[in-house]
């Protein structure tokens, strides 16, 4: 069965909003499992120092953070997640995002991680907002790369979880009917809009072919029907949102997109938005120097940062 045109169009619209992700080839590095696997994700731990949790995006392996870990491992103990149903990991029952959120908080508690830095890409960026808003006294600074509190509003400024629900359910049903090969074909078709290097884009498609289509559909449906823009006001640590402007054609469009990103995090008391002018959705791959410089500056300013006491 060939994927329907509606599914293809929806995937393309998600790509425009920065929500379809895949992993890429990585360099070998020394890692170790961080204890027994949590059922909604696998963890590898590398480095030493302050804890940093890195969460990849949709149909991505945690290996997407390889260069980021290499950059930070001499100062941070990097806990890199690969989420259930993605990149060969076993799937879990719905709800997907809430389960991952709760398991990350449990992982922080069980491993006695002291206010870890949270870093997320795309779907992972959404998750770091939710984790921090749910337990604002348990986490440190937050970096979201191309992840926003409510993706639906990027595609349609008037969208709400309720107005998106019917289409989300339809999309979830259609994804459940796809094979892994079909999911891989769809991802491969859109990756050139998300990763500059064609070789990386081609390699990335292979990761989606080891992901569970039903999990991908469930995750996207949940992203369409959970709006964290008000909830995120509970976050009490500094937040850096890194957007990608590499495919934006003119200054007017750049200003509009930047304003849309600013609006997404407007309720977060301490936030910054920076745009990577030469990167597409995978900023950590297209322009790692920009991302690392932005993170170094942000984390330096937030050094030792713990949640502010709510007045």
Segments from the language model and where they lie:
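Bacterial N-terminal signal peptides
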Residues: 11-22
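Active-site loop/oxyanion-hole signature of alpha/beta-hydrolase fold enzymes
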Residues: 36, 79-119, 123, 133
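Conserved HGGG/HGGXW glycine-rich cap/lid loop of the alpha/beta-hydrolase fold
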Residues: 45-90
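Conserved hydrolase catalytic core segment
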Residues: 114-156
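Flexible "cap/lid" loop of the alpha/beta hydrolase fold
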Residues: 142-177
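Conserved alpha/beta-hydrolase catalytic His-Asp/Glu region
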Residues: 154, 158-159, 174-231
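Conserved loop-alpha-helix segment in the C-terminal half of the alpha/beta-hydrolase fold
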Residues: 236-279
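Catalytic active-site module of serine/aspartate enzymes centered on a nucleophile-bearing elbow/loop
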Residues: 268-311
């Amino acid at each position: 069965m060939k994927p329907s045109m509606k599914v293809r169009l929806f995937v393309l619209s998600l790509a425009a909003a920065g929500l379809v992700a895949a992993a890429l080839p990585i360099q070998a590095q020394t890692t170790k499992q961080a204890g027994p696997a949590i059922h909604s994700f696998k963890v590898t731990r590398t480095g030493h120092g302050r804890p940093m949790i890195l969460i990849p995006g949709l149909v991505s392996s945690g290996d997407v953070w390889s260069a980021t870990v290499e950059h930070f491992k001499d100062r941070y103990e990097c806990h890199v997640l690969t989420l259930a149903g993605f990149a060969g990991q076993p799937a879990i029952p719905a709800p997907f995002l809430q389960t991952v959120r709760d398991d990350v908080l449990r992982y922080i508690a069980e491993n006695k991680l002291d206010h870890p830095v949270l870093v997320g890409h795309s779907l992972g960026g959404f998750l770091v907002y939710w984790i921090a808003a749910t337990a604002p006294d348990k986490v440190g600074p937050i970096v979201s790369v191309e992840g926003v509190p409510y993706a639906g509003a990027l595609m349609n400024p008037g969208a709400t979880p309720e107005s998106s629900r019917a289409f989300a359910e339809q999309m979830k049903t259609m994804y459940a009917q796809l094979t892994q090969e079909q999911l891989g074909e769809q991802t491969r078709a859109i990756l050139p809009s998300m990763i500059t290097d064609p070789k990386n884009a081609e390699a990335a498609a292979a990761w989606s072919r080891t992901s569970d289509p039903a999990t991908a559909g469930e995750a996207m449906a949940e992203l369409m029907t959970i709006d964290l823009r008000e909830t995120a006001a509970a976050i009490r640590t500094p937040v850096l949102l890194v957007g990608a402007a590499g495919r934006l054609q003119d200054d007017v469009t750049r200003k509009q997109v930047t304003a849309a990103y600013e609006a997404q995090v407007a309720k977060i008391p301490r936030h910054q938005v920076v745009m990577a002018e030469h990167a597409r959705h995978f900023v950590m791959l297209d322009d790692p120097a920009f991302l690392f410089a932005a993170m170094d500056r942000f984390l330096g300013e937030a050094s030792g940062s713990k949640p502010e006491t709510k007045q």
